[in-house]
C-alpha cells in the first residue's frame, strides 16, 4: 500500500516553471480554441440565457404586480376600516349625546316627581294639622259642654225642688203635645 504523503513529498522534486512572462506561442496558448468555445457558448447559450433572464424578468414583474394588487387591496381595506371607524365614532357620539339628553330628561323627571311628592307631603301635613285642630276644637267643645252641663245640672239640682221639677216636666209634655198636633 502506498503512503498517502508520497504525492506531497514528490512536489518538492518538481522542477520550477521558470520565470513569469507572456507566452507568445499561439498554438500553446490555444486562443483559437478558446474563442471557438466562447463563440459556441454565446451562440447556443444566448437563447438559454435570454430565456433565463426573461423568466426572471417575468417573475419579477409578476411579483411587482402581485405586490401592487396586495397594496391596493390593503389600501381598500384600510379605507373601509377608516370608513367603519368614522361610522362607529359618529354612532358613539350620537349615543353619547342621546345618553346625555336621556340623563337630563331623567333628571328633570326625578326633580318633577320629587317636587310632586313634596307637595303631596305638604298637603298631607296641612290636612293632618287641620284634622288635629278640628279634633282639639271638638274636645274643647265637649269639655266646655260637659262642664256647662255639669254646672247647669248642679245649679238645677241645688235650686230645683220636687214641685218645680214636676211643673217643668208638665210644661215640656204640653209643648210636645202641641207640637204633635201641629204636625198632624
Swiss-Prot record:
Question: What is the purpose of this protein?
Answer: F(1)F(0) ATP synthase produces ATP from ADP in the presence of a proton or sodium gradient. F-type ATPases consist of two structural domains, F(1) containing the extramembraneous catalytic core and F(0) containing the membrane proton channel, linked together by a central stalk and a peripheral stalk. During catalysis, ATP synthesis in the catalytic domain of F(1) is coupled via a rotary mechanism of the central stalk subunits to proton translocation. Component of the F(0) channel, it forms part of the peripheral stalk, linking F(1) to F(0).
Instruction: List cellular component terms (GO).
Output: chloroplast thylakoid membrane; proton-transporting ATP synthase complex
Anything else the record notes? In plastids the F-type ATPase is also known as CF(1)CF(0).
Give GO MF terms, alphabetically: proton-transporting ATP synthase activity, rotational mechanism
Describe the family membership recorded for this protein in Swiss-Prot or TrEMBL: Belongs to the ATPase B chain family.
Q: Which UniProt keywords apply?
A: ATP synthesis, CF(0), Chloroplast, Hydrogen ion transport, Ion transport, Membrane, Plastid, Thylakoid, Transmembrane, Transmembrane helix, Transport
Record field: transmembrane? 27-49
Subcellular location as annotated = Plastid, Chloroplast thylakoid membrane
> Could you tell me which Pfam families the record lists for this protein?
ATP-synt_B
**What membrane topology was assigned to this protein in its record?**
Single-pass membrane protein
The subunit structure is: F-type ATPases have 2 components, F(1) - the catalytic core - and F(0) - the membrane proton channel. F(1) has five subunits: alpha(3), beta(3), gamma(1), delta(1), epsilon(1). F(0) has four main subunits: a(1), b(1), b'(1) and c(10-14). The alpha and beta chains form an alternating ring which encloses part of the gamma chain. F(1) is attached to F(0) by a central stalk formed by the gamma and epsilon chains, while a peripheral stalk is formed by the delta, b and b' chains.
Chief subcellular location: plastid
- Provide the protein name: ATP synthase subunit b, chloroplastic
Amino acid at each position: 500500500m502506498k503512503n498517502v504523503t508520497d504525492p506531497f513529498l514528490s512536489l518538492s522534486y518538481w522542477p520550477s516553471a521558470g520565470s513569469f512572462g507572456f507566452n507568445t506561442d499561439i498554438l500553446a496558448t490555444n486562443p483559437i480554441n478558446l474563442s471557438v468555445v466562447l463563440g459556441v457558448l454565446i451562440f447556443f447559450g444566448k437563447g438559454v440565457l435570454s430565456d433565463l433572464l426573461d423568466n426572471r424578468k417575468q417573475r419579477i414583474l409578476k411579483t411587482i404586480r402581485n405586490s401592487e394588487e396586495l397594496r391596493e387591496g390593503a389600501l381598500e381595506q384600510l379605507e373601509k376600516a377608516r370608513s367603519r371607524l368614522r361610522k362607529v365614532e359618529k354612532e358613539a357620539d350620537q349615543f353619547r349625546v342621546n345618553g346625555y339628553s336621556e340623563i337630563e330628561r331623567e333628571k328633570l323627571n326625578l326633580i318633577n316627581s320629587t317636587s310632586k311628592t313634596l307637595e303631596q307631603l305638604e298637603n298631607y301635613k296641612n290636612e293632618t294639622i287641620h284634622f288635629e285642630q278640628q279634633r282639639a276644637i271638638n274636645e274643647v267643645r265637649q269639655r266646655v259642654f260637659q262642664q256647662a252641663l255639669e254646672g247647669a245640672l248642679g245649679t238645677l239640682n241645688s235650686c230645683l225642688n220636687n214641685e218645680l221639677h214636676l211643673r217643668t216636666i208638665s210644661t215640656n209634655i204640653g209643648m210636645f203635645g202641641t207640637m204633635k198636633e201641629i204636625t198632624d
